[in-house]
Design a protein with these regions (language model features):
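Residues at secondary-structure transition points
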Residues: 14, 38, 42-45, 62, ...
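N-terminal helical cap/lid subdomain that shapes the substrate entry/recognition surface
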Residues: 2-103
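Residue-level detector of anion-binding/catalytic polar loops
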Residues: 33, 106, 183
């Protein structure tokens, strides 16, 4: 293997519960019958796909752009919500990145989140110096589970997709990396019912990654 590629939300930082809860509060205000579980399929997807689904759950014959605009303009300013990124940062990320560099491997993040937000979060948790490439789903017409973001990340790194291992947690992310032809090690998260069947291996924590990676490539 020549590269390790991380997803960000749910892997490097445990943001999924915060993101889902924040949006769910808005959705539930608009549609009292909505359930938190309705938000689970949003994990790992770009904003457009997320808001298409949210608009569908809310109903009211509003398009996704109008729904998102209402959320950003009217809801968010009156409902402040801070995510403690440093507190939910998985510090074993640094261990893996240092190990990868020491073993001649390139490193990247491939996240569905908007690029500036990805940079902001990764800078706050001090991961950026250990990365060769940061790729955002906002630059792609199709989001995870489409493999485009992973294929492009491998291209920018200058390696074959088959020489990459991806660390993912969500169904969409695991599917995207697998479709790109990469090895996939899934970080287990049973809170959201993610399907990990396409992963090559599973880990309970990032601290288990190096051992499982070595076992995987030595099969």
């Amino acid at each position: 293997m020549k590269a390790v590629i991380f997803d960000m939300d749910g892997v490097i930082v445990d943001t999924e519960p915060y993101n889902m809860r924040r949006v769910y509060e808005y959705v539930h205000f608009q549609q009292p019958n909505a359930k938190l579980e309705d938000m689970y399929q949003n994990a790992g997807r770009v904003k457009k796909d997320v808001w298409i689904r949210i608009a569908s759950v809310i109903g009211q014959n509003r398009g996704w752009e109008e729904t998102r605009s209402d959320y950003e303009t009217n809801w968010k300013p009156s409902h402040p919500f801070e995510i403690p990124y440093k507190e939910i940062f998985r510090k074993d990320t640094i261990t893996i990145l240092k190990w990868a560099r020491e073993n001649g491997m390139k490193t990247a993040v491939a996240s569905s989140t908007a690029y500036e937000k990805v940079k902001e979060i990764l800078t706050e948790v001090q991961v950026v110096p250990y990365l060769d490439v940061i790729t955002s789903g906002e630059f792609f017409e199709r989001s995870k589970p489409d493999p485009a973001i992973y294929l492009k990340t491998a291209e920018v790194l200058g390696v074959s997709p088959g020489d990459c291992v991806a660390i993912e947690d969500s169904t969409a992310g695991i599917t995207a990396a697998s479709r790109a032809g990469m090895k996939v090690i899934a970080l287990k998260d049973d809170r959201f019912g993610f399907d990990r069947s396409l992963a090559d291996d599973e880990i309970d924590s990032l601290g288990d990654f190096i051992e499982h990676y070595q076992r995987l490539i030595n099969k």
